[in-house]
């Protein structure tokens, strides 16, 4: 079964949303500064990006520097995400640019999946032995409500999305665990993340856009084959305020000597010497 992301704190039931305090909305410039700090703290390989959903296509097209994918061609969403995070493109995506009534379009709320998907016929004999398993995969996949005309993607450093609905970045497992440590630094909460399997974009931007919660995913075969995601890369998606919280936490961890890259102490060395520095005065 595909589990949904839940963030837990204390004895709160695991299916409750995490408690959030009201904070002023961060503008594009402030988020760009956070992205630069994140890059410095985690030494990311590619640009952190933002995503913003639009009910009005004209409003999306008014985003500064927006470009549209070539007419007459369709791409997977993960391909367009990679164009943004690697080449720095600000892209506007509609149903003209991704396969319509597919997982790509329905995960980001541009339409609903077609019968060939929901029935299980599409993935039967490919990703799943039988139609029932393929249909269950589709039924449990996180998706945004299908009421949007477009999605804009842009590097956070450009400050063109004011402000994005969610922020995303790719990184290796060491970078991801430090980011989570940063989220937990001041106000602890426990995280659980979902694994849909194939169509893992539903666990990252799909889940984050739908719930506005921190979402960590293991990119799937298609994201790696078509989107060019590297073998060691994972994907983090979160609202801007969680990015701010994590950066603050990473700065606090850095002051305690907990930084990226993580310096190996050595598997055959006595750990007491290293721990004595991290936990000085704690005995």
Go through the PLM ranges and name each one.
Residues 28-283:
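Acidic, serine/proline-rich low-complexity intrinsically disordered regions
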Residues 1-5, 10-35:
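Cys/His-rich short segments
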């Amino acid at each position: 079964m595909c589990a949904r992301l839940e963030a837990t704190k204390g004895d709160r039931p695991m299916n409750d949303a995490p408690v959030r305090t009201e904070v002023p909305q961060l503008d594009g410039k402030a988020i760009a500064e956070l992205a630069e700090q994140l890059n410095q703290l985690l030494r990311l390989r590619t640009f952190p990006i933002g995503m913003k959903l639009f009910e009005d296509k004209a409003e999306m097209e008014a985003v500064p520097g927006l470009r549209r994918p070539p007419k007459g061609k369709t791409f997977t969403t993960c391909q367009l995400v990679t164009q943004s995070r690697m080449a720095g493109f600000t892209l506007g995506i509609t149903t003209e640019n991704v396969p319509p009534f597919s997982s790509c379009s329905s995960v980001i709320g541009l339409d609903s999946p077609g019968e060939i998907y929901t029935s299980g016929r599409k993935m039967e004999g490919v990703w799943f032995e039988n139609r029932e398993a393929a249909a269950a995969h589709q039924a449990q996949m996180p998706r945004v409500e299908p009421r949007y005309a477009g999605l804009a993607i842009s590097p956070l450093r450009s400050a063109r999305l004011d402000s994005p609905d969610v922020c995303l970045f790719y990184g290796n497992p060491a970078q991801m665990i430090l980011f989570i440590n940063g989220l937990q630094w001041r106000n602890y909460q426990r995280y659980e993340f979902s694994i849909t399997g194939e169509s893992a974009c539903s666990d990252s931007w799909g889940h984050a856009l739908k719930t506005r919660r921190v979402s960590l995913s293991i990119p799937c075969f298609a994201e790696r084959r078509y989107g060019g995601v590297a073998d060691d890369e994972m994907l983090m998606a979160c609202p801007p305020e969680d990015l701010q919280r994590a950066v603050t936490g990473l700065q606090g961890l850095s002051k305690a000597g907990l930084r990226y890259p993580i310096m190996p102490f050595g598997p055959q060395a006595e750990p007491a010497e290293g721990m004595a520095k991290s936990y000085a005065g704690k005995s």
